Amino acid sequence: MEENRIKIWIHKIKDTAVVLLHFLAVCSPLSLVCVTTPELLAGETIGQWVWFGKAVLFSAGCIVAACLLQLFDGSSWKKMLSFSCFSACVSWSLILLGGIEAVWGLRQLYGFSASGHFRYALTGSFFNPGPYAGYLAMVLPICLHHYIQFGGWKWISTSLKLEKVAAGIVGVLILCVLPATMSRSAWIAAGMGCIWVICIHQDSYKSVSYTHL
């Protein structure tokens, strides 16, 4: 009995480590968005390219480590290469980086961090507010999706509650920063994206309710 419990715990730890390695493999290249090189001239991208090269090597190492963990556990090659949690890793990487960008923008608004352009008070890690607002507008519907996809609080697990809280906090931070960017196109994009997410979830709720009738 005790041996079975130990095996179960080892299996859970292995699965958690594999998911974490997959997340790091996805998040490291996407973290390029947060790389700034204020010491270089405007338009120079050599710093970003250097970071991207290192991130790709780190990502490859994480993928190899995850495959080895699964191989030692006796998993099939199909399971190892399926990368079943890829979409979740991408979503949560964008949410994490979107939260960092939102906090970055708030710090610039209140004068705790320097802007990326002398003409604008709010740029995040970007050179001007336009791309910054577009990035936040892209992340906001993802936050909304993760907040409402599991419904209410009563019947979900603690881990899903933590996911809802994290997505909700990042969404609120983005809502605090996005109006200050003064980018109407980003406002429209964020609004249309959120409306689309709400419509998709309403359709899924209706289909679930019809199946229970």
Enumerate the language-model features and the residues they cover.
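Interfacial loop-to-helix junctions that mark the boundaries of transmembrane helices
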Residues: 44-53
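Alpha-helical transmembrane segments of multi-pass inner-membrane proteins
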Residues: 9, 15-34, 54-73, 79-118, ...
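Short, Lys/Arg-rich, polar N-terminal cytosolic tail immediately upstream
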Residues: 1-10
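Membrane-interface helix-loop junction between the first two transmembrane segments
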Residues: 35-43
